[in-house]
Amino acid sequence: MNLLTFIAPLAVAATFMMPADAANHKELPALGNTHIQVFDKTPVCFRPDSFPNYTPANADGVIRLVNGRIILKKITLPDYKRDVDVTLKVTVASNGDRWDKSGSCFVLPKESVINLMNIAEGKRAFPAVDSTKYEKMIGIVPGQDYVPTLELMRFMTPFGVGYYSSDNDSLSSKRRPVYIPKWEKSVTWVQDITDLYPALEREAYVGIYIDTWTAEGYVASMELDVKESKITCDVMPERRVKPLMNTVYYIGQTYPDIFSRKDVVMDFDMPKAAKNVRLKYIVTGHGGHSGGDEFVEKRNIVSVDGKEVLNFIPWRDDCASFRRFNPATGVWLIPRVAAYIGLSLIHI
């Protein structure tokens, strides 16, 4: 039994490999590279008059949850025998929402009986949590028949990129600083997610959540690129992914402010034979109210079995370099945490 302690809003997963039998050398078939355009400028919005809590797949296979604020789709990948590299690409543009919003690209864990989809359908519910440890923070840690949603990437939407980016826009045309030549039309983030491939292999449900409360919302695109090894004997290692915690409030959950009051502790088991174990940590520093860490330096600490393994302050002082993605906002002069508007959040 291992003990994990956190003091920051986050998504965490453990990835590890199991020992392989090197003696069983053989030539493996090539299945080729795979490119999947999961979403292509798909609206992410808040339209309770059009989308109920659960909207079945449309002609493009897109499922919508929580009144359109989550888009979800089933993907299928070849049954690769050789090792692969996996890259995720997410592109977002405003469709009329001019504000900065938190966003999450995720996959539903296959081993979880309870997930966002059947919760939205009203068929299941998040399991109860120990209120002495987690207060009312349902859905953030594993429970009976439940594994937290596995986050692939987290991001912050820019202020109005795309919708307000034209040269003659009444809002932004007079706000462009002299040091940028133009407003960008969208923002794109790219992330290596090879370690998380086991959650995607064969079939999986992947999605994007944006915390928008407007009918216009955003348009989002998502691409997956899987590159197969060219080495004929490069066998796919036995990787495993274990989602430990996810504090994104996807559906009917509480805003994750528990870290302002206490450290969060959870138990997890690690196989004795596991090798190359990695702790994947994604931190969000957004929300400046009541001592929030958007403009205040807050230390992020992770401990395993009482031993500190991570201690840092997510912080940047080059806000101006992202100004071109934010036509619907004013001048940026103040250093901020990792939640730069138009920046993918810190992945460790």
Language-model-derived ranges and their functions:
Residues 183-248:
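Ser/Thr/Pro-rich, low-complexity mucin-like regions
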Residues 346-348:
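Conserved small/polar residues in nucleotide/adenosyl-binding loops
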Residues 299-311:
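Short strand-turn-strand beta-turns centered on an Asx-Gly dipeptide
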Residues 92-96, 282-292:
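Short amphipathic, basic-aromatic surface patches that mediate peripheral association
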Residues 98-104, 290-301:
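Short coil-to-beta strand junction motifs in C2/discoidin
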Residues 64-76, 258-269:
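Short beta-strands within extracellular/lumenal beta-sheet-rich domains
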Residues 1-27:
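Bacterial Sec-dependent N-terminal signal peptides
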Residues 79-88, 270-280:
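Extended extracellular/luminal ectodomain segments enriched in beta-structured repeat modules
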